[in-house]
Regions:
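Short acidic/polar hinge/loop motifs at secondary-structure boundaries
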Residues: 132-161
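Extracytoplasmic beta-strand/coil segments of soluble accessory domains associated
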Residues: 86, 90-133
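C-terminal beta-signal and adjacent terminal beta-strands/loops
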Residues: 2-4, 619-625, 651-700
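Face-selective signature of the C-terminal outer-membrane beta-barrel domain
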Residues: 254, 258-262, 266, 298-439, ...
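Gram-negative outer-membrane beta-barrel transporters
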Residues: 357, 364, 417, 423, ...
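Surface-exposed extracellular loop regions of Gram-negative outer-membrane beta-barrel proteins
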Residues: 271-285, 378-389, 433-436, 446, ...
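Membrane-embedded beta-barrel scaffold of Gram-negative outer-membrane proteins
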Residues: 194, 211-214, 307-311, 317-333, ...
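Transmembrane beta-barrel wall of Gram-negative outer-membrane proteins
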Residues: 204-232, 236-274, 296-311, 454
Length: 700
């Protein structure tokens, strides 16, 4: 029987992490003068802000960015009490963590839907890690059924819901989400921290999360940082054991005050036992039980990236980076009768290269920042499947498909500044060649796509605090690997196309941060599976329309008032996502809520901090027909809305510099809520019960 390679035992990895951390601590790095900042030009952003919207100069670029954008920094992540990436992202306006896949609740997958778009494995957003696509095959399989990402290694999360299609296409109708790993320290000596957290679920079990970070920079300009994050234990379902190891080694060498080389080596492995869905009768008897104890997902990914950045002058910047990753993932799922196991091992290799150049020049009464860039991605991989008889272990039904994609993208945009206006027209052009070869039947399926994607972003800096913005962007989704072999002369598949318009306002002052955005998305030509076809047949059938409003407010009370130390925050999203084709035209898209909100308050006084928050999502439907009545298997029916409350306290130990403790409760009232999955392990999936956690961290 085929089994996936999961690497060494986690205990040995933990000892390895400690050894590397101690090795780093054994060196002394003298203080290093930080790189001189590029001078500001007539009040405009520096080139490295204009040249890379998701790169340096984050806060300045957010303030005047011409689209809806939210950034969560390290302290925001810690105060949220989030256990997983999904926990964190569901607090961001317009974002819903759907958890409606068969591996929901585990660490292996990411299920994020933006503005009513499907959230199962996050296929409609461009998900990046340090600006590099996170998906193992960004074009051929953008779904994140395997998401090699750990919350403890993340320094910030940048969620751009509109306005970024030119730089980060093509699959971004649901925006761009960039996870930035922790930066290499530039201060004197070695600095870092180690943390240990235990999560205790009111039902099921508990898990331990641990992390280590250490790094520094020498006086010759060479810097290094080691990152490790791990997890062991179980979730809130019976026999939902899980193991995660996430390593990264980052390096940077400052060649001159304006140029640098940077690189990162990474390794990730995960094993998750996934309980799957329950029938209505099983859920009523015990929503936390596991009737599929043989089901599991596993994955391994190794990656390397290297780049060169040169801020040539106040008006020029050049950057080039290349990256490589090798990944494998496997799912094992038992059939309904419990007699057969379906194994699906998949392997991927992806190589990419991205050069970019930005030039600033004056033309008439305007200042222009013109950026030209190119990206080539080469994907190779194979999808395999076979069955194993539970009683005898006999293997049968072997199938193999070999996949290849070569994607070329070129883009140009010009940020034109005149007076208080910032107008950025842009164009991205994609040329994609994809091939899928059926090894068993010796059949080849091919498709070539060429697509121009125009956009325009506009910002008006009304005052120092207030920015008005609007944008129009186009994006598209390519024909994916698993869809290629259903193509024929009578059923030619073409890319999905989306057009997005949004407008809004952003306020930023010492005490108040606020943003209001309205949006409209027309998403046409969606590739949909024809119901009742086995194997699945795909056609260009789907059309949906999404519109809504997103509101965000963060207020810090005056330091001289009676409420000094207090701050309050809130966000609210209303989304209407409707099907516009077929028999269910006019009905809601499945697995999204029309309304979501988060409301909370923070208090900080000396070493003590307190955070109280609540999140809410409205009802959902699990099928296109918006069926309210529940089916016996639990896969179909209304999904009621729910509200949960969370509380956290944090404390910095006096006299023990660098030591702090976080403790809290998620789902304070132990609200019972659920979603559904229509995957092969279909049924009802209970949400997390009341969860207590405590974390200790020592920073040096």
């Amino acid at each position: 029987m085929h089994t996936s390679s999961l690497g060494p035992h986690p205990g040995r990895r933990t000892r390895c992490a400690a050894a590397i951390t101690l090795a780093l601590l054994s060196f002394h790095y003298p203080a290093f003068a930080q790189q001189a900042a590029v001078s500001d030009n007539a009040g405009l952003e520096t080139i490295n802000v204009s040249g890379d919207w998701l790169g340096s100069g984050l806060e300045n670029s957010v303030k005047t960015y011409p689209g809806a954008r939210t950034v969560a920094k390290k302290e925001d992540i810690e105060r949220s009490g989030a256990i997983s990436i999904g926990d964190l992202l569901r607090r961001i306006p317009g974002v819903q963590a759907s958890d409606n896949s068969g591996s929901a609740g585990s660490a292996i997958a990411l299920n994020i839907g933006v503005r009513g778009l499907t959230g199962r494995y996050s296929p409609r957003s461009t998900i990046l890690l340090d600006g590099i696509p996170l998906a193992s095959a960004p074009y051929g399989q953008p779904q994140l059924s395997f998401a090699p990402l750990s919350l403890n290694n993340i320094e910030s999360v940048d969620v751009i819901r509109g306005g970024g299609a030119v730089r980060y296409g093509p699959q971004n109708v649901g925006g761009i989400i960039n996870f930035k790993t922790r930066s290499i320290p530039t201060g004197p000596g070695i600095s870092g921290d180690a943390a240990l957290r235990y999560n205790s679920y009111g039902q099921g079990g508990g898990n331990t999360q641990y992390s280590a970070f250490a790094g520094g920079q020498s006086d010759n300009g060479f810097g290094m940082a080691f990152l490790y994050s791990g997890q062991e234990g179980s979730g809130w379902r019976n026999k939902s054991d899980e193991r995660v190891n996430d390593f990264a080694l980052k390096m940077r060498y400052e060649i001159s005050p304006t140029s640098e080389l940077y690189a990162k080596l990474s390794y990730y492995d995960v094993l998750s036992r996934t309980p799957g869905g329950l029938t209505v009768a099983q859920y009523n008897a015990d929503p936390f039980q596991n009737t599929r104890q043989r089901d599991n997902w596993s994955g391994t990914r190794k990656g390397f990236d290297i780049g060169y950045l040169n801020t040539i002058s106040d008006s020029q910047e050049f950057e080039i980076r290349t990256y490589f990753n090798q990944a494998s993932r496997q799912s094992t799922l038992v059939n309904a009768a419990g007699t057969s196991l379906a194994h699906q091992p998949r392997n991927y290799e992806t190589v990419g290269i991205e050069p970019r150049y930005t030039q600033r020049f004056a033309l008439g009464g305007t200042t222009n920042d013109v950026t030209v860039g190119y990206r080539y991605i080469r994907e190779r991989g194979d999808d395999n499947a076979y069955n194993e008889a539970v009683a005898t272990g006999a293997l049968s039904g072997f199938t193999t498909f070999q996949n290849s994609t070569d994607a070329h993208a070129a883009y140009v945009d010009d940020k034109i500044a005149f007076g208080k206006w910032r107008v950025t027209p842009g164009l991205r052009f994609e040329h994609i060649q994809s091939t899928r070869y059926d090894v068993n039947n010796k059949a080849t399926f091919q498709v070539a796509n060429n697509k121009p994607l125009p956009s325009i972003n506009v910002a008006y800096l009304l005052t120092e605090q207030l920015t008005l913005f609007s944008n129009y962007n186009t994006s598209f989704g390519v024909v994916q690997n698993t869809q290629l072999n259903t193509m024929s002369a009578s059923n030619p598949l073409s890319p999905e196309l989306a057009k997005t318009i949004e407008g809004g306002a952003r306020w930023k002052s010492a005490q108040v941060s606020a943003e209001a955005t309205v949006f409209h998305i027309d998403f046409d030509n969606q590739i949909a599976s024809i119901p009742g076809t086995t194997p699945s047949v795909f056609r260009n059938l789907g059309k949906t329309r999404h519109d809504g409003i997103e509101l965000v407010l963060d207020y810090a009370f005056d330091k001289e008032s009676i409420l000094k130390g207090w701050s309050a925050y809130a966000n609210y999203t209303y989304t209407r996502a409707l099907q516009k084709s077929g028999a269910n035209s006019g009905k809601d898209v499945p697995f999204y809520s029309r309304t979501t909100d988060t409301v909370g308050a923070r208090f900080q006084s000396g070493p003590w901090g307190l955070n109280l928050s609540t999140t809410h999502q409205g009802r959902q439907f699990s099928d296109e027909a918006n069926t309210v009545a529940e089916s016996a298997d639990g896969s179909t029916g209304e999904i009621p809305g729910f509200r949960i409350w969370n509380a956290q306290v944090n404390w910095k130990m006096p006299g023990a510099k660098g030591f702090d403790v976080f403790a809290g409760v998620n789902n304070l009232t132990d609200r019972r809520y659920f979603t559904r999955t229509t995957d092969g392990n279909l049924g009802k999936l209970v949400g997390a019960p009341r969860t207590l956690y405590v974390q200790g961290r020592y920073a040096f």
